[in-house]
Amino acid sequence: MSQQLFKICLLISVLVGVLGLAQAQQSLDALLDRDIAGLVSTYKSLHAAPELSHFEEKTSAFVAKELRTLGYTVTERLGKYSRPEWKGYGVVGVLKNGAGPTVLVRSDLDALPVEEKTGLPYASKVRTKNDAGQDVAVMHACGHDIHITSLLGTARLLAELKDQWRGTLVLVGQPAEEATDGAKAMLDDGLYNLIPRPDYAIALHDIGDLEAGTLGVTPGFALANATKVDVTVRGIGGHGSRPETTKDPIVLAAQIVLALQTIVSRELGPLDPAVVTVGSIHGGTRANIISDEVKLQLTVRSYKEEVRQKILASIERIAKGTALAAGLPAELAPIVKVSDSEVTTATYNDPALTERLKNVFMKLVGDNKVFPVAPIMASEDFGRFGLEGNQIPTVMFWLGASDPAVLAESRRNGKPVPSLHSPFFAPVPEPTIRTGVKAMTAAVLALMKK
């Protein structure tokens, strides 16, 4: 009799859970039907008015105003940078709803120095001065406008659905993601003293490789760490007709660039992904002058910190060893400078939390619309919110943004769809935003349910 009773209770529990999920999904769909037109309008306004990293003043103020209107306690101007002229434009909105977990949801705010070529009626025409005083075009070419809109849509739904969750909800508008120092700036300015330390931190990122209306998940390492390295190769200059009297830094730089390619192929294990890219090389002023200096700019990427450290040590060894072999005196050895600002940690998705959210998403949009996504060597500073050693479980999931017809044509003709950072990157607004808001809201409800 007791076993029979147990089975009946279990069946009732399952039915109640399924019914509750169905009702919750219907509720989200109904609320989104009401809100979607306004959210798309918000997205188009944001897209047309992008701001560069460290200068997100209007975007930040807009997010703060919207969160206050929804009843969140808002703190503005959060962020402490290495350069005093950069102001902190971080925004934090907090909504307390009784005892329970603290969940942090983050969106980035900044745009890129890219001239938009989408031809859309709401395309950015913004031009501004960058940090170097150069006139540049600005575009939301990485979809942060989608992220902001999804955050605001989620903020509204969760404020209305307070009877379905408990705890403290923290919504973060983070500046300077593209510069990779915005998350650090907010943490250095006391973010985790301002709010309860999160039990979970989650974020989404749109991607052109997936159809709008679909989602992607990556357990474990999802994005790489990144470090900028500057190498100044010095030499002894002279006349181009008398190279024997010089130590040509252009030849040295060429040898160094080629030698750097062996770090990944010959010094690292094949199961440790890494990238060493020389993205910039500048030296000399005219054809008949052998210069005395060449400047290289590198990006170094890996998943593991120990791999990163090994690469950095190898760069210095190769640069200085090449100069020594060429007969340069010690006082003219290359100068290797590892940036302490243009550096960010890897994004590590907590496997258990990723699996939990994947199950939520599969029930929400269907098993056939949630895809595994392989780790990539691009970088994000969202992982910093998990603190060193991944103390706080974090997940960044992928939000499909492309027109299905465009993706289908891409598969047929082999021509890739416009990627993130492309001047042609153009998410399909309505289904992308709808899915982003729905998925993020469902994720928070699952983590904070009563």
Describe the predicted segments one by one.
Residues 1-8:
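Positively charged n-region of N-terminal signal peptides that target proteins for export
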Residues 8-20:
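Bacterial N-terminal signal peptides
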Residues 25-140, 149-153, 157-166:
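Acidic/His- and Gly-rich active-site-bordering loop/insert found
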Residues 33-37, 50-61, 141, 145, ...:
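Soluble non-cytosolic domains of exported or imported proteins
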Residues 46, 93, 105, 144, ...:
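Divalent metal-coordination and catalytic microenvironments
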Residues 90, 127-139, 145-146, 157-280, ...:
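Histidine/acidic-residue-rich, glycine-tolerant segments that coordinate divalent metal ions
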Residues 251-450:
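Metal-dependent amide/peptide-bond hydrolase catalytic core
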